[in-house]
């Protein structure tokens, strides 16, 4: 279940990794958030900001010891920002993160591929991350407790060791 859950207050999708380009090592981080605005849920106007989509991204030139970063925010809708409920497909203006299942392999688990595209003022990314192992669930069956109360929890899993290209 990689899609958005609009009834929940906050969700995020993030990727971190490193990639080599032109004999240089770069670190990268891209995070998309979806946040439900509780105070606007009963409003009838299409202009009510019921869901906010925001994102930040960074690239580090390891050898050059420089970091570049940027961020975006918009309310969902109007063709500007969206987080699909059916799969990981998040878009915020010209930034995106999408997921797709890969054709069946001999692996004992289903592999998937993520792609992120980010056009920032000082950098751009177009990366594909292909799964190499099954997801790792955090906590009890992916439910990660954040406090003593049952509602103080979130579902959380990681997909490490993805093969990165782009």
Show which residues each predicted segment covers.
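Targeting-peptide/extracellular-domain and disordered-appendage signature
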Residues: 1-166
């Amino acid at each position: 279940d990689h899609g958005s859950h609009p009834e929940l207050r906050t969700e995020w999708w993030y990727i971190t990794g490193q990639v080599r380009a032109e004999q240089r090592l770069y670190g990268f981080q891209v995070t998309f958030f979806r946040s439900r605005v509780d105070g606007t849920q009963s409003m009838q106007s299409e202009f009510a900001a019921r869901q906010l989509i925001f994102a930040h991204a960074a690239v580090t030139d390891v050898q050059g010891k420089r970091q570049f970063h940027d961020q975006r925010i918009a309310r969902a809708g109007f063709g500007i920002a969206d987080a699909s409920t059916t799969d990981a497909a998040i878009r915020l203006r010209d930034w995106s993160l999408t997921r797709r299942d890969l054709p069946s392999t001999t692996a004992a688990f289903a592999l998937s591929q993520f792609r992120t595209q980010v056009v920032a003022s000082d950098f751009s990314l177009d990366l594909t991350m292909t799964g190499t192992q099954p997801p790792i669930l955090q906590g009890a069956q992916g439910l990660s407790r954040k406090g003593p109360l049952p509602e103080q929890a979130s579902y959380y899993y990681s997909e490490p060791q993805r093969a990165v290209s782009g």
